Amino acid sequence: QLWATGHFM
């Protein structure tokens, strides 16, 4: 998911 990208990165 898009939000997951910013959350992990």
From Swiss-Prot:
This is Rhodei-litorin. Pfam families: Bombesin. It is found in: Secreted. One of its GO terms (biological process) is neuropeptide signaling pathway. Expressed by the skin glands. The modification Pyrrolidone carboxylic acid is found at residue 1. The keyword Secreted applies. The modification Methionine amide is found at residue 9. The keyword Secreted applies. One of its GO terms (cellular component) is extracellular region. Belongs to the bombesin/neuromedin-B/ranatensin family. Keywords: Amidation, Amphibian defense peptide, Pyrrolidone carboxylic acid, Secreted. InterPro entries: Bombesin (IPR000874).
